C-alpha cells in the first residue's frame, strides 16, 4: 500500500464538496481521502499520492491513439467507478483525461469538486467534455444526470480510439496539450462527429454506434447507465478479437 500523501489547497466550496463526498467512498478506482480539516485556519484535504501521470499525458505524449484492448481496460475501471458514484445518487460532472490518474495500469478518478447529487443543478464543468444541454443553458437550470457523465465518457473513448477529439478538427488542434473548440459545434444538433472508424482504419465499425450513442445531442437517446455502456463495449471488443 502506497501511503504517501499530498496536501492540496483548493477553494473552500470545492474542497468541502470533495471532502464530503469522498469521506463516504470506498472504491479502488476513486482516489482515497486520508484526512481533512475544513475548520482550520487554512482548510486542507489529504489524498493518496498517485504520481503525476494522467490519462492526458498518455493521449498527448504518446501516439495519440490507444489500442482497443487498453481502451477496454481503462473503460472497465472508470465505468465501474462512475457506476458506483451514480448508484450512490451522484454525478461526477467533470470527466476528462487530466482527472484520470494512471499508475501501473490502474486508472483512478480524482478531483471531485464538481460532483453533484442527481437532480440538483450543476455548477460547471470543462468545455469540450460538457454535454450540449449544459452549454446551451450556461449550466443554469440543468439538473445533474448520469447522462452527462455518459456523454463525457463518449468524448474520452473517441479520443482514446482515434487520437482526436470528436468536436475539434485536426486543423484546430494545437501542440500545447489542449484543443480549441467552436461552442456552436457542440450545441448544434445537426453537427455530428466523424465516424471513429474513418479516423482509425483498424477500428471495427461496431464501435461507431457505441460512440455515437454516447454522444447523442439528446440525453434521452444516450445510454442511460454506465453498466449497459460497458457491456456493449465489451461485446464489441470480444467480436473484434
What role is predicted for each listed range?
Residues 86-102:
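Catalytic-loop of the protein kinase fold
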Residues 40-54:
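Conserved short submotifs of the Hanks-type protein kinase catalytic core
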Amino acid at each position: 500500500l502506497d501511503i504517501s500523501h499530498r496536501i492540496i489547497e483548493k477553494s473552500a466550496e470545492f474542497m468541502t464538496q470533495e471532502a464530503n463526498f469522498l469521506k463516504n467512498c470506498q472504491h479502488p478506482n476513486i482516489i482515497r481521502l486520508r484526512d481533512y480539516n475544513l475548520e482550520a485556519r487554512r482548510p486542507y484535504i489529504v489524498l493518496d499520492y498517485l504520481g503525476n501521470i494522467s490519462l492526458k499525458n498518455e493521449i498527448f505524449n504518446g501516439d495519440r491513439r490507444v489500442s482497443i484492448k487498453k481502451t477496454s481496460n481503462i473503460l472497465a475501471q472508470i465505468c465501474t467507478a462512475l457506476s458506483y458514484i451514480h448508484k450512490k445518487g451522484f454525478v461526477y460532472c467533470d470527466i476528462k483525461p487530466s482527472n484520470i490518474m494512471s499508475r501501473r495500469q490502474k486508472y483512478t478518478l480524482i478531483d471531485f469538486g464538481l460532483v453533484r447529487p442527481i437532480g440538483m443543478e450543476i455548477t460547471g464543468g470543462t468545455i469540450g467534455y460538457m454535454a450540449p444541454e449544459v452549454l446551451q443553458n450556461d449550466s443554469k437550470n440543468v439538473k445533474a444526470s448520469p447522462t452527462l457523465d455518459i456523454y463525457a465518457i463518449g468524448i474520452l473513448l473517441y479520443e482514446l480510439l482515434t487520437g482526436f477529439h470528436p468536436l475539434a478538427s485536426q486543423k484546430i488542434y494545437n501542440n500545447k496539450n489542449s484543443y480549441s473548440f467552436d461552442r456552436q459545434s457542440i450545441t448544434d444538433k445537426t453537427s455530428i462527429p466523424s465516424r471513429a472508424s474513418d479516423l482509425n482504419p483498424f477500428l471495427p465499425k461496431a464501435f461507431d454506434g457505441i460512440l455515437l450513442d454516447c454522444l447523442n445531442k439528446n440525453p434521452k437517446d444516450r445510454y442511460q447507465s454506465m453498466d449497459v455502456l460497458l457491456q456493449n463495449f465489451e461485446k464489441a471488443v470480444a467480436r473484434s478479437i
